[in-house]
Amino acid sequence: MILLRAKVPLPAKVTLRITGNTMGNSLLPKHIKHITVPPVKCQGIKTKLVNFIASSISWEGKGKWIEPFLGSGVTAFNILAPKALLADTNPHIINLYRQIQKREIDRNTVKEFLEFHGAKLEKGDGDYYYEIREQFNRTKDPLLFLFLNRASFNGLMRFNANGNFNVPYNHKPNRFSKAYISKICNQVSTLQNILMCVDWEFITAPWEHTIAQANANDFVYLDPPYIGRSSDYYNSWSYEDALKLSTQIHSLPCGYAMSMWLKNKFRTNEYIDNFRTKDEILTFNHFYHIGASETLRNSIVEALIIKPGYSNKQNFGNVKLYLQEEIALDNMWDKKSQNDLYSQRLHRFHR
């Protein structure tokens, strides 16, 4: 097992230099010039880590890109494999993306829907939000799901034991401003254009069923719920589930990579010990937010676990670019926190 830690000095001024190139004829590794942001928001979304993931994996792209924990879909929407099997146990995410794929939902339907209900929300405040939430739990309408996803507290996506959405209202004035609606519509339109050019299947299925479809030329990317942290997983996720997953992925006939948190300032994820002797691990430091205040920013070390033979060794000298992108994506960081985070240079060690 090789554990690689990505830390570099903070540049004085952030200037992104994007190549947008793949290496040879392979799909991965590559660097993505413009990150596609999905219309669905999830906690733990990998927007800031997309280029880190895409540039760390080596895969020819001859088979299917398989994701058993799709979540927002941000990784798949940026990897852009010609063929993909994208699954989640959350039927509402899958239903929304299927309807966008079939063009039953497009930017115009989203614009009209959000403008109408956004105006009523502004007048009715929390009461109207809870009316919409109750209506969604009865009808499962994908547009209502999108509305709740953008109007709920802190972008949470949480369901009770009966499968009902139960996140409270986000008391933010002018929640569905003209600019915000345009942003969501653009995200829907971008995704729809992608789906017109690829052969992707969206399914509601447990992860066991999904990875069982993998063949030799495929690649499985896994972003399971983080043990010990709140997650958006539609069903429960236990330590026993995680152990079962670690056993089964080591039996896959194809390449795989798994995202996981390694440690934060409070503790270390001991579950990662299941991969230390069999896989290569690349780590990446970044901040996550649990609120608008600077005091609520926390650093976390993310790990990308990769099957031997499927990692891009040349990527290890290019980590500076990904860190520059993260700084550009998050202008709320203060300079002291940045300098503390990037005080060390890239280094390797063997276990």
For every predicted segment, state its role.
Residues 59-62, 79-84, 214-218, 250-255, ...:
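Short glycine/proline-enriched coil/turn segments at helix->beta-strand junctions
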Residues 63-127:
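SAM cofactor-binding core of SAM-dependent methyltransferases
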Residues 16-59, 104-221, 225-230, 345:
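SAM-dependent nucleic-acid methyltransferase catalytic core
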Residues 72-75, 90-93, 151-154, 207-210, ...:
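Short, solvent-exposed loop/turn segments at secondary-structure junctions
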Residues 2-5, 10, 15-17:
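Intrinsically disordered, low-complexity proline-rich tandem-repeat tracts
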Residues 238-350:
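Long, positively charged, glycine-interspersed low-complexity recognition regions
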Residues 82, 194-200, 277-279:
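A short helix-to-beta-strand connector/capping loop
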Residues 171, 209-211, 224-246, 264-268:
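Residues lining hydrophobic/aromatic ligand-binding pockets adjacent to catalytic sites
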